[in-house]
Regions:
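Single conserved hydrophobic/aromatic residue that forms the stacking wall/gate
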Residues: 1-7, 11-12
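Short, hydrophobic secondary-structure boundary micro-motifs
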Residues: 4, 32-34, 166
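Helical element adjacent to the flavin cofactor pocket in flavoenzyme catalytic cores
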Residues: 19-23
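PLP-dependent aminotransferase class I/II
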Residues: 25-27, 77-78
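Short glycine/serine/threonine/alanine-rich loop segments
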Residues: 28-29, 118
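Conserved PLP cofactor-binding pocket of PLP-dependent enzymes
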Residues: 29-43
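Conserved C-terminal structural/oligomerization subdomain of aldehyde/semialdehyde dehydrogenase
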Residues: 37, 44-181
Length: 181
């Protein structure tokens, strides 16, 4: 009988495929891998890799929530300019990662992109947060940067303040440990 298709699942599949179809028809992009999703057999979409020459390409600036990644190859001589471009390209910032061996490149990327994603990884895969151990949920227009169950989510709903009560009133205004005479 097969999988029963729910309307929202088909909508998601159609949305993902619209990005892939857009890339297939664009002179600024090439589908390097995958790119298929046969509606007649279900809502499965193949993992897809798109390469673009336009850093503002649709699949670079919008969240897809599907098995699609878009690659933009930058000029090594324009590394710092490319980092700035990455920081301002999209209003979304769920998860991000950089891979590098050069300490200067890592430090520069970290300092430029430190607020670009809810979870930011250096030389590690961006697979998501450890549940209830680190905040997760994105930044910018991606989520709330915390999830229920974690301590930072609790802090989100609090208004911390400090209250001090002195039980032994001071007898002088000086500081004896400063050696005042």
């Amino acid at each position: 009988i097969g999988v029963r298709l729910v309307g929202s699942e088909m909508c998601i599949r159609d949305s993902i495929m619209s990005y892939i179809d857009y890339a297939k028809q664009s002179p600024d992009a090439e589908v390097l891998f995958g790119g298929n999703g046969d509606k007649s057999v279900g809502y499965f979409v193949e993992p897809t890799v798109i390469q673009t020459t336009d850093p503002m390409f649709k699949s670079m600036v919008e969240e897809i929530f599907g098995p699609v990644i878009t690659i933009y190859v930058y000029d090594d001589a324009k590394y710092e300019e490319t980092l700035e471009l990455c920081d301002r390209t999209s209003p979304y910032g769920l998860t991000g990662s950089i891979f590098a061996r050069d300490r200067y490149a890592i430090d520069k990327a970290f300092n430029t992109l430190r607020y670009s994603a809810g979870n930011f990884y250096i030389n590690d895969k961006p697979t998501g947060a450890v549940i209830a151990q680190q905040p997760f949920g994105g930044s910018r227009a991606s989520g709330t940067n915390d999830k229920a169950g974690g301590p930072l989510n609790l802090i989100r709903w609090t208004n911390p303040r400090c209250i001090k009560e002195c039980l032994v009133p001071p007898t002088s205004y000086g500081y004896p440990f400063l050696g005042e005479k």
